[in-house]
Every structure is written in C-alpha cells, then in structure tokens.
C-alpha cells in the first residue's frame, strides 16, 4: 500500500509540475533546497553571498525544512509544493540533501542542479550503498522515488571521496567533483585567529579543565544504540587530560555517569574542535574539520565490526589510517599520551577526507553553477 501511495504521489507531482513549468518563466535566480534544517546552512549562506558578488543579476531564494526519515506531514507537503514552483522558474538549484522534487520531476533544460551534500566526507555509507540495511532506505522506495537522480554535478571534499559518492548516488564518476565545501573556506581563513576569548569562556564554564590538555571526543550517533565508550571513560588519565565528549544532539541512548568527564552541551562542535589539543573521531566528518585546523586526530572504533554491518563503511580507519586508529581504549590512550599523531598523519587525513578544500571552494562552486 505504501508503495502504491508513493507512485500516485509521484505522478501527481509530475502532472502538477508540468503546468507549473508551462506558466512559470525562467528567471535569473538560484534556489537552495534542503531537508537538513529549517534554516539555511552556512554553506548555503556563503554560496548566496558569493553569487551576489560574482553574478549580481542572480537572486537567491531558500527553501529549507527539516525532513525526518519515514515521516511526512502537511508542512512537508507544503514545502515540496513551494520547492516545485521555485524549480520551475530557476536557472540554478543547489541542494545539500536528497530532495524529492529534484529527483522525481522532469526539469527544464535551462535548470542546472548541483548537489553539495551536507558533509564533505562519507566515511560511512549512505544512499544506494545502504539499501535494505538497518539504517538505509528500502530498495523499493529508493527505486520508486528515484533516489539521488537529477543532479548535473555533485561536489565532494576530496578526490579520494569521489568513488564513494558516485556509488551512493549512482552517478558517473566524472560528475563527482572534488571542489571542497564553502564552510572549509571559512575554517581555513580563521585557522590562525586568536581564540583567547573562546578559551576563557570554556575555562569559566569548566574550571576543572584549566591547565590540562583538552581531548575532544566526537562520536557518531548510533540509532537506538549507545556509544561504546565505557572503557575509554574508565581508563582515561584525568590528571593530565580533560576528556570532553560532544554527543550527537539526537543521541538519547548514551549515558555517562563519570564525574570527571565533561559532557558538553554549551559549545558548538566547531568551537570544541577549535579548542581541542587532540580530537578523537570514529566515523564522522569531524576528523576532516580537525585536519583542516591541523589538530592531531585519532580514530576510536571499538564497535567497527557491528557498525560496518549495520551502516556500512566507505573508510575503515583501521586500514586507511592504521597509525592513528584503535579498536581498544588502552591503545588509544597510550597513543595520545605518546603524541603519536604526526604532521604526516594529519596531512594524510586532510588529503583523503578534504584534499579539495583549498580556501577557494565557494567561488569554484559558483563558477561551476554559472558555466
């Protein structure tokens, strides 16, 4: 029944879109579509600013609404109708997520669609790579809804990431472009900025961290499962280091009761990476951001076998970054204590995860859009 409803919806949208295209003239505008948030992301805002400078005749419009998986209400339907109307009269569309109207509708030839995704890296698998897996889409729904069809180009963070995105979106490799992300431009531009005020705020909030090296752990959320960090928390050397754990905002399963650990909810992920002396990642894009800031990065993957079966992995840190990746908490702690992450290790993480981020990604994406 669900599949039948989806088919009816798809063909109904196509019928309506035919008339929208017929009566909507193409204008010099770029439309930004997203299901990641109700507000334009920083990537979107930076691109809109660049469009205003590079192509001042182009106007920017945002159509953003947080879309939950397997959920659609009246607000979602209303937003899709607005997105359809916008697409019917646009010259350029930038998206950072899978958006139904982009993939299932037949667009005017004047419209160029660029997918920048919401993460410059894809350490874990997604899209067509994870069909019928616990955290993936069903193959029936993916085919009916033509998941990730309709893009002219997909922008990623590095050349190494290209084949993974090509597989996840079922696109030719030549359409996957390692131009980097706009937000990386800003991170690189602020790399040498003074952060004394931010540090003062942190030490005022967490006075017991003063005088200690700050180790920031940024675990990926496991849907319906707690982060496996009990051994790390128990064995961690708190006299020398402050362990700050920044859980995913949607993580409701991980509980940590050790009073020595800082479970931060005050500062942003980027602020914590900026303040970190050491960053611990697992399967998220946090490692890329840390590498852009030349931070020592380690990968902690105690549940890698289970996680790979549940979510799928494009990048196995134990294989790709063996010198700085650990499945055992004791080995990770020893490596941090020995400052084992070298400049070469950080450079390798940066090359593989965000090698296309050279500080000029925003302008390159806009140039691509205007070609």
Regions found by a protein language model. Give the residues of each.
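Membrane-proximal basic amphipathic "stem/tether" segments
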Residues: 1-37
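Active-site and donor-binding regions of nucleotide-sugar-utilizing enzymes
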Residues: 31-191, 196
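Conserved catalytic-core segment of nucleotide-activated headgroup transferases in glycan assembly
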Residues: 40-50, 168, 176-255, 326, ...
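Short active-site oxyanion
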Residues: 59, 91, 149-154, 242-243, ...
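Nucleotide-activated donor-binding/catalytic signature segment of Leloir-type glycosyltransferases, i.e.
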Residues: 251-267
């Amino acid at each position: 029944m669900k599949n039948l409803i989806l088919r009816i919806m798809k063909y109904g949208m196509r019928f309506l879109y035919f008339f929208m295209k017929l009566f909507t003239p193409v204008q010099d505008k770029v439309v930004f579509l997203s299901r990641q948030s109700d507000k334009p992301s920083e990537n979107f805002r930076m691109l809109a600013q660049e469009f205003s400078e590079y192509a001042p005749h182009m106007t920017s419009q945002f159509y953003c609404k947080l879309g939950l998986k397997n959920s659609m209400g009246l607000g979602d339907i209303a937003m899709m109708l607005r997105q359809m109307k916008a697409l019917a009269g646009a010259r350029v569309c930038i998206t950072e997520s899978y958006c139904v109207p982009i993939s299932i509708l037949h667009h005017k030839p004047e419209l160029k669609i660029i997918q920048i995704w919401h993460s410059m890296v894809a350490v874990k698998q997604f899209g067509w790579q994870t069909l019928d897996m616990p955290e993936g889409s069903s193959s029936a729904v993916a085919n009916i809804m033509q998941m990730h069809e309709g893009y002219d180009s997909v922008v990623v963070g590095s050349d190494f990431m290209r084949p993974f995105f090509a597989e996840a979106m079922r696109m030719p490799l030549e359409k996957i472009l390692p131009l980097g992300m706009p937000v990386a431009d800003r991170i690189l531009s602020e790399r040498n900025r003074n952060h004394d005020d931010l540090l003062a705020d942190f030490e005022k909030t967490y006075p017991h961290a003063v005088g200690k090296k700050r180790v920031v752990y940024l675990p990926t959320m496991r849907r319906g499962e707690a982060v496996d960090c009990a051994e790390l928390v128990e064995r961690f050397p708190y006299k020398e280091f402050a362990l700050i754990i920044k859980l995913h905002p949607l993580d409701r399963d991980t509980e940590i009761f050790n009073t020595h650990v800082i479970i931060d909810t005050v500062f942003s992920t980027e602020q914590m990476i900026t303040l970190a002396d050491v960053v611990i990642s697992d399967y998220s894009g946090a490692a890329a951001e840390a590498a852009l800031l030349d931070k020592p990065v380690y990968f902690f993957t105690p549940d890698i076998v289970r996680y790979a079966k549940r979510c799928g992995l494009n990048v196995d840190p134990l294989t790709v970054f063996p010198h700085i990746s650990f499945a055992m908490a004791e080995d990770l702690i020893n490596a941090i204590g020995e400052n084992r992450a070298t400049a070469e290790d950080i450079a390798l993480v940066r090359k593989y995860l965000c090698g296309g981020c050279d500080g000029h990604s925003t302008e390159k994406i806009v140039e691509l859009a205007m070609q």
